[in-house]
């Protein structure tokens, strides 16, 4: 793959993570650059790892992986989205302080859910005999940058109440998961 194709692929793979990061940033109380970079690093490492895993699995069991990857992504994102939406809907009218950071587990689960499509790309690249390491590295770096920017953009958009942001963020995650599932089931671009 040439550099332009690699960068375009990396941008495409980071789009879901960017959208999730905006909602994560909006839920935080004035996230600082360090929190944005921490979130970006978590997403970037996971997003870079999944095409490597996909490429490895593609060498061994492509049919099985591609048959289930979209269901895994949908399940993770739907679970997280429903959890966020429920949390936003069940508030009891009390003003809730926004937290200063998200837990590692929550960020890693969200990153994993948004990176399952990168695993599929890894499977596909295994059949094309493409060196996966530079591609995975580019995906990780671009995702780290996009997610860090997304968290900071979420800070700007985060003036809405925490509950509204949780509901919107949850619906975004459910939407991303549903779109991944739809694309795989119906072959939409």
Swiss-Prot record:
Transmembrane segments: 3-23, 41-61, 62-82, 103-123, 132-152, 167-187
GO molecular function per UniProt: manganese ion transmembrane transporter activity
One of the record's GO cellular component terms: plasma membrane
Topology relative to the membrane: Multi-pass membrane protein
Keyword field: Cell inner membrane, Cell membrane, Ion transport, Manganese, Membrane, Transmembrane, Transmembrane helix, Transport
Entry keyword annotation includes Cell membrane: yes
Annotated Pfam families: Mntp
NAD listed as a keyword: no
Signal sequence annotation: none
Localization (cell): Cell inner membrane
Domain of life (superkingdom): Bacteria
Primary residence: membrane
Its job: Probably functions as a manganese efflux pump.
Family under the similarity heading: Belongs to the MntP (TC 9.B.29) family.
Identification of the protein by name: Putative manganese efflux pump MntP
Source organism of the structure: Methylobacillus flagellatus (strain ATCC 51484 / DSM 6875 / VKM B-1610 / KT)
